[in-house]
């Protein structure tokens, strides 16, 4: 999110919440300086102009850490607000830095996003919804482009809509389908095996600036998506299953913890790892020795009056489409130690995707998957399935 939207959204909270923040700030010191008071009570119009200039200095995209620290140093009230924004999305529900796109979403809510499709350029843009309206401009998060090959199709995912090169630092991963469009593999272009990364960083001769750009980038499988045969063709609901290779079932337990990367690796670091080094990725982590999490789509019900298959998207989907789906933890992934009954666990939506316009779709996701993983799964829904439809 932009600094402007973060601060203005927090300042627009109910008066009681703002008062609590002020009281907490006052508790840090017996007296609050007049300068702190002036900054905390600055008119919203003037605050907006200041933040616009700060965003312009950052290039209009993601806020730099320098800008976040500078805002935190303005006064105690701003420091408390900034403390909330830099917490991981699992707790704050905020996407403050690019690495937030690779971190799990919130546990108790869903991050509301939407996808815009361009049929001419075969591109897809993911935006973060800044309001409850389905028509807002949103904050750009990720972009993807479709590349057709003889035996497969690739969806290249990037941090920039104007740079889809796999050799770019903006490259974050890809989705590859088989010829029939029934099986997909999600590759993470920024995931480093712990052993290989440690050796590179400890090496005295390692210099990222001197690494040849011709060395192929490493991509590591993090999820497998499967669409099953639909006997009703395009008239019936799709049946899909997602095997999350890097997310163990224990993350669904009350005290479960999902892995949270803290930064993107340097391009040079990523380039020097060969594809063969990605094979021991699963065994290199104690987390991945457990059974991986399996997500399956929630079965829709047939509505006799409307004569269509229905799911409750709580107003987030307005157009009936075979692409619409909701993902929940599969029964085998719930486990007996989750502290939650299988019936209740099956009602917890982890990812939902649906159509709201000709080329507009909503995407809402939550813990334990990230925005990148959710976007990759949704991209698979756009592919034509020769064997299923």
Curated annotation (Swiss-Prot):
- Give start-end ranges for the coiled-coil region(s): none
GO CC annotation: plasma membrane
Among the GO biological process terms of this entry, one is:
regulation of DNA-templated transcription
Renumbered to this chain, region (Disordered) spans: 250-289
Q: Which InterPro entries match?
A: F-box-like_dom_sf, Tubby-like_C, Tubby_C, Tubby_C_CS
- Tissue expression profile of the protein: Ubiquitous.
List all Low complexity biased stretches. Answer: 273-286
**F-box domain location:** 36-82
Q: Which CDD domains match?
A: F-box_AtTLP-like
The family note in this entry says: Belongs to the TUB family.
This protein's name: Tubby-like F-box protein 11
Identify the coding gene.
Answer: TULP11
């Amino acid at each position: 999110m932009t600094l402007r939207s973060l601060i203005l959204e927090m300042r627009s909270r109910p008066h009681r919440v703002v008062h609590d923040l002020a009281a907490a700030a006052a508790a840090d010191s017996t007296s609050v300086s007049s300068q702190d008071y002036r900054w905390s009570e600055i008119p919203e119009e003037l605050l907006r102009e200041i933040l616009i200039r700060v965003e312009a200095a950052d290039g209009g995209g993601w806020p730099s850490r320098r800008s976040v620290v500078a805002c935190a140093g303005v006064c105690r009230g701003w420091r408390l607000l900034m403390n909330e924004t830099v917490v991981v999305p699992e707790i704050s529900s905020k996407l403050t830095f690019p690495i937030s796109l690779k971190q799990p979403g919130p546990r108790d809510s869903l991050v509301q996003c939407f996808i815009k499709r361009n049929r001419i350029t075969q591109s897809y843009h993911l935006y973060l919804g800044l309001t409850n309206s389905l028509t807002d401009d949103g904050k750009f998060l990720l972009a993807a482009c479709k590349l057709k090959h003889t035996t497969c199709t690739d969806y290249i995912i990037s941090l920039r809509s104007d740079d889809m090169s796999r050799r770019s630092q903006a490259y974050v991963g890809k989705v590859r389908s088989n010829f029939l469009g029934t099986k997909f593999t999600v590759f993470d272009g920024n995931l480093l095996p712990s052993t290989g990364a440690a050796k590179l960083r400890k090496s005295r001769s390692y210099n990222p600036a001197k690494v040849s750009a011709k060395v192929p980038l490493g991509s590591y499988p993090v999820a497998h998506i499967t669409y099953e045969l639909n006997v009703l063709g395009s008239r019936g609901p799709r049946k899909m299953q997602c095997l999350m290779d890097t997310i163990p079932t224990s993350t669904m337990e009350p005290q479960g913890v999902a892995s949270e990367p803290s930064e993107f690796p340097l391009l040079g670091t990523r380039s020097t790892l060969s594809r063969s080094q990605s094979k021991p990725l699963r065994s290199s982590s104690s987390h991945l020795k457990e059974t991986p999490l399996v997500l399956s789509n929630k079965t829709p019900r047939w509505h006799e009056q409307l004569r269509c298959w229905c799911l409750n998207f709580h107003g987030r989907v307005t157009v009936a489409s075979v692409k619409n789906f909701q993902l929940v933890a599969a029964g085998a992934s719930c486990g007996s130690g989750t502290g939650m009954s299988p019936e209740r666990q099956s009602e917890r939506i982890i990812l939902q995707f649906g159509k709201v316009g000709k080329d507009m779709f909503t995407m809402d996701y939550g813990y334990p998957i990230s925005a990148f993983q959710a976007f990759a799964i949704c991209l698979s829904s756009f592919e034509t399935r020769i064997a299923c439809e």
